[in-house]
Amino acid sequence: MKFVRGFPSTMMDDYQLNLINILRYAATNFPEREIVSRKHDENIFRYSYGEAFKRVCKLANALEKLGVEVGDRVGVLSWNTHRFYELFFGISGIGAVVVEMNLRLHPNEIAYIANHAQVKTLFVDETLLPLAEAVASKTKIKKFVVISDNCFETKLPEAYSYEDLLKNEDSRYDFPMIDETSAFAACYTSGTTGMPKGVYYSHRAMVLHTLVVALGLSLKAEDVYMQLVPMFHANGWGVFFAATLAGSKLVFPGRYAVDNLKPIVELMQSEGVTVTAGAPAVFIPLLTYLQKIEPKPQFNIRAWSGATEPPIAMMKGLKEFGIEIIHAYGATETSPVVCYNYVKPELARKLSENEIWELKRKQGIPVFGVEVKLVNDKGEELPKDGKTIGELCIRGPWVTKSYYNDPRTFESFIGEGWMKWWKSGDAATIDENGYIKIVDRFKDLIKSGGEWISSVDLENHLMAYPKVFEACVIGIPHPKWQERPIAFVVPKPEFRDKISKEELLEHMAKRFLKWQLPDEILIVKEIPKTSVGKFSKRTLREQYKNYYQKE
């Protein structure tokens, strides 16, 4: 593919795509549409897009007085609240960069991110002050702003109150036209290999991404969107930007835990939620909770979910409560949306119901603007036949072309310049209809006796068993077979003492060959997880690496 420059257009191509214009649009055209935020005391705060824009103007004025300048990196440690929402627009609106800090990381990793990004100012939720205090001395952060409704005490130097800063500021601000290729936010990968890697998102990338997300979820002003995905995780998947553009009502649930989803379900019911997004780590416990309570609630919700392969039991179970799971795929490096799954009309007409459910488990087809291909270990492109497994490589206008100030960039990309592709590390197939299926992470595929075993396939079949809540499969070194799979199973609470390894193996033997079955199935209370809720297979592999040396 070559690059050519054609005849010049007469369009205003110098008009820059800036993120602040999304909120300005909503405030102008949907000024009364509501934004709802659940506070730590479980009281509900309500205001409108029109009021939110005025507060963002106040925030912009306050940031200038704090000494925040164009290009400065400003850290945010917060839950999903209306103030985090304001910070995204206020910080980026003046030309600075929102550094999304994963509050579930170790303090040393948070300090690393702050130093690597050269964060000078940190906004921190009052409930996270102990974490900020533990990090502060390891960084060069000069100013701290506490996000709180109350008076607070802290050991942090030069600490300000968020609301006090905004209180007397002008509710008007002349936002600059920012070069659209400038960064508006940064997110650091969760560090599955070494320390976190920085991805810096441009205004242009996020505005284009927002348009595609709004289209993919068919967002409208009548919709009510709940932000379940942590807003520090790849811009909260960017859906709240798309919902803002559509003029949808926004619901921010604040701090919540998957082992107590009652407040979330109550909020979904009281606010009339119609759209949400989240990982199976949220939706599986949600299904378990809904199955327990009486009376059974009924929703009308379309929900994006991202996973290697969502369990059919989860998708079918939530469907009974009116929650339609739409499978999607992405990564921090892709802003994050790469593809989402919808059944093409011509396939819907000829596939059986079971075949449609199987199709829905695939990642889907790439969204407009994103290109994908499969390559082998030599970088050669592989066929899209639904069978050949290769590494999924991705490029597009909201895909990163490097990691910020990080030598690991070299090993993560192929190609040069605008022809560059990001190597996802995912083992995948692409079928003749364009549907991507993630088979596994390459590092999680199990090589046994020269043959590959997908840990994901084993996990999903285990999780389809009625007594199983969660299941994780890893490969561990074996003296004869190179690697062998072992499984970790968390039973549903009511079956904790009523489940056996033998019945699980019998269940799995109906689908898998004997050599593919786990050598061991361990019944455990919990499975370790990463900061973004995925199974921490690295932790398990380290713990069980000498398992066969005991024999």
What residues fall within each predicted segment?
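Conserved pre-ATP/AMP-binding loop-to-beta segment of ANL
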Residues: 31-34, 158, 167-188, 195, ...
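Structural core segment of the AMP-binding/adenylate-forming
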Residues: 23, 65-66, 93-167, 493-495
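Conserved AMP-binding/adenylate-forming core of the ANL superfamily
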Residues: 35-81, 85-89, 106-111, 161-163
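Conserved ATP/PPi-binding loop(s) of AMP-dependent carboxylate-activating enzymes
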Residues: 349, 365-369, 377-413, 451-453
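AMP-binding/adenylate-forming catalytic core of the ANL superfamily
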Residues: 105-111, 120-124, 269, 276, ...
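Conserved AMP-binding/adenylation subdomain of ANL enzymes
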Residues: 207-224, 234-274, 284, 289-290
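Conserved AMP-binding A3 loop
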Residues: 45-50, 184-208
